UniProtKB/Swiss-Prot annotation:
Subunit structure: Interacts with PcrA. The interaction is not essential for cell viability or repair of UV-induced lesions.
Identification of the protein by name: Protein YwhK
Gene disruption: observed consequences: Non-essential, it can be disrupted. No PcrA-related phenotype.
Length: 451
């Protein structure tokens, strides 16, 4: 939740100008309704077999956003602004019940009534003033036909889902000392569950379609597969070499696992090894077209055909090439070169397999390169600067003073999650200014993270 902070003076002025109150009203995304059904004389409905059906119209609903205050810290002047998103108006329901029979049990008709459900409620709080929901997403759930009792007529009850709950976006951390994976709901910044594993985990990545999570166990030559929806281990892939890193490409059917001496191509749906390509090195990136691997080995970058295993090109560098990344759909590779206190970022055009540019980075910088989603980033542990990497080079986008084990951005780019191994926690940074948003305590030591 992003916090729009106000000074105490601004808060007082805002209160005087707009009579702001604190955000204390309860928010609910649902509204209950009960529609009485009057049956024509001489007709009956058996509630045990009756079925209800509802169609609706919400054209008269409107959305308003009311400013309100939230406490952002323990001090009285630590106050921010949010917006209470309220829906007001009427949802018109056409409620039907069937079968309707005559007093002799004959017939198979239906009876319908129009019921107006009055709506006036806060559905959620937001950081944005224009964050109204899509009215077309309204659904009706939990329909129940209630038999008449104590003079009350037959009725239909149900729930109007005004705003669906957001789909969970999970962060997964590999906890090597605990043989587990922690699952965090990034909508609420809470730990949903901890998944026990048979071995110590190292690397961890989510498939592009978010159907599964692949967890690497290099000490055991094993990959565990976690179902994204059920959050359970559903499969184990056995290799004859230790998996050291894993890559995925959007819209491709394979996972690419590097062992240091080979690239294993594994079917995401079949969870079987399709083929392995012998190649030696210590880091690898996959071409966005899925046809080539780019392998680092001391001072060289090799281009390897993932079908034949043939080395089709080599680029030599003077410094040690330490890390390589690609980002989809752009066909560029980014190589971090480091030796002693010197640091360079080299951009390779994959269409021609030639160097596009080389950028000198900060002297004595402690750089690491990582991907999150389709983007590539650099982090300098010496200065705390965070860089976005593109074909034009690297540019500073923020400063994160506390170094971490691993980093991952939420898909919308609003927050950066940083794992802290010794502290057994995750720091969540707001990417507006890279201020600390919250700290999530895990109770275990997290290593790699993926969102």
């Amino acid at each position: 939740m992003r916090k729009n902070k106000l000074s105490f003076k601004e808060k007082a002025g805002a209160e005087q100008e707009e009579c702001l109150c604190f955000c204390e009203g309860e928010a609910s995304r649902e509204a209950m309704f009960q529609a009485p059904i009057e049956l024509p004389e001489g007709f009956v409905v058996d509630p045990a077999e009756a079925v209800a059906n509802v169609t609706w119209n919400a054209d008269s609903l409107s959305c308003v956003s009311d400013r309100c205050l939230i406490q952002t810290g323990p001090e009285p002047d630590e106050v921010g602004v949010q917006f209470a998103v309220r829906l007001q108006g009427t949802v018109t329901l056409l409620v039907s019940v069937s079968p309707v029979r005559n007093q002799y049990g004959q017939g198979d008709g239906a009876v319908s009534v129009i019921h107006n459900a009055e709506i006036d409620q806060v559905v959620y709080y937001s950081d944005e003033s224009d964050d109204c929901p899509d009215i077309s997403d309204i659904t009706i759930e939990n329909l129940v036909v209630v038999p008449p009792f104590y003079g009350s007529p037959l009725s239909v009850t149900g729930t109007i889902v005004l705003v669906p709950e957001p789909e969970p976006v999970y962060a997964f951390t590999a906890n090597p000392n605990d043989q587990s994976v922690s699952v965090i709901d990034t909508n609420t910044d809470t730990v949903v569950t901890t998944i026990a594993l048979p071995y110590n985990p190292a690397g961890i990545e989510i498939t592009p379609d978010k159907s599964a999570v692949f967890v690497l166990h290099p000490n055991n030559n094993v990959i565990s597969v976690i179902d994204y929806d059920t959050l359970t281990v559903t499969a184990t892939i056995l290799l004859d070499q230790p998996p050291r890193l894993i890559r995925f490409i959007p819209n491709h059917e394979f996972a690419y696992v590097f062992t240091g001496t080979a690239v294993y191509v594994i079917g995401i749906d079949t969870l079987t090894v399709d083929r392995s390509i012998p190649v030696e090195g210590y880091d690898v990136a996959i071409d966005p077209n899925g046809l080539f691997a780019y392998v680092l080995n001391f001072g060289i970058v090799q281009k390897v055909d993932l079908t034949t295993g043939e080395v089709t090109g080599t680029i030599e560098r003077e410094l040690i090439v330490s890390t390589i990344e690609t980002n989809w759909p752009e066909r560029y590779a980014y190589v971090l070169e480091q030796e002693f206190f010197f640091n360079y970022l080299t951009v390779i055009d994959l269409n021609t397999f030639t160097i596009s540019s080389t950028q000198e980075l900060e002297y004595e910088g402690e750089y690491r390169m990582f991907t999150s989603g389709a983007e590539v980033y650099l982090y300098d542990g010496f200065t705390g600067n965070l860089y976005s990497v593109s074909p034009n080079g690297a540019g500073v986008i923020g400063n994160v003073p506390q170094s971490a084990t691993d980093y991952a951005f939420t898909p919308n780019g609003d927050f950066l999650y940083a794992t802290r191994f010794i502290e057994q926690s995750i720091i969540v940074y707001n990417t507006d200014d890279y201020s600390e948003e919250t700290v999530i305590s895990l109770g275990v030591s997290p290593g790699a993270i993926t969102i």
